[in-house]
Amino acid sequence: MSRLENLTSKIIKDSEEKAKIILDEAKREEEKIMLGQKQEGESIKSKIIEKAYLESKNRKERIISNSHLFVRNRKLEAKQEVIDKVYKEALNKLAKLNKEEYLNFIKDSILALEIYGDEEIILSQDEKYINKETIEEINKELKSKGKKGEIKISDKKRDFRGGFILNKDGIEINNTFEALILSLKDDLEPVIIDTLFS
């Protein structure tokens, strides 16, 4: 029996050694896997942190850029409001010309135009100074310049602040105060901006 016990004892011992080897190998494999997982986790963590950093940096830059754009647009809007007020004030001053200044402006404007002298003059619905006598004076001066001198006041009235529109065969020359200011706008805007905002 002692031989049987020795054999059994040896089998048990061999089994325990094999089990220990298998367990040690399993433990090393587990550590290897854990190390790989840890390294992969660290790599993923680094990538996530880097991505978050880049996204936050880009977001910050977008916010700053949008802020600059917003401020610039507000400045432009404010400048445009001031410019619009300047034009409105200019229009108001033209509309408040006294009778003599206004009629001289109308006469000088018509006489300076390259026209035939037989156009129809369309006036503002609020016109208070231009009448037949005014047109007769203008016609006399047109004749003295070799033109027809047959301008007539139109029955049509339009909605504008002052000035006039000359019409012949459907072609109009717009000399209203609004049109004059608008035509000068491109030339005057840089001057106004320099004067007001420099």
Swiss-Prot record:
Any single GO BP term: proton motive force-driven plasma membrane ATP synthesis
GO CC list: proton-transporting two-sector ATPase complex, catalytic domain
Domain of life where this protein originates: Bacteria
One example GO MF annotation: proton-transporting ATP synthase activity, rotational mechanism
InterPro entries: ATPase_E_C (IPR038495), ATPase_V1_Esu (IPR002842)
UniProt keyword list: ATP synthesis, Hydrogen ion transport, Ion transport, Transport
Cited function: Produces ATP from ADP in the presence of a proton gradient across the membrane.
Name of the protein in its database record: V-type ATP synthase subunit E 1
Organism of provenance: Clostridium tetani (strain Massachusetts / E88)
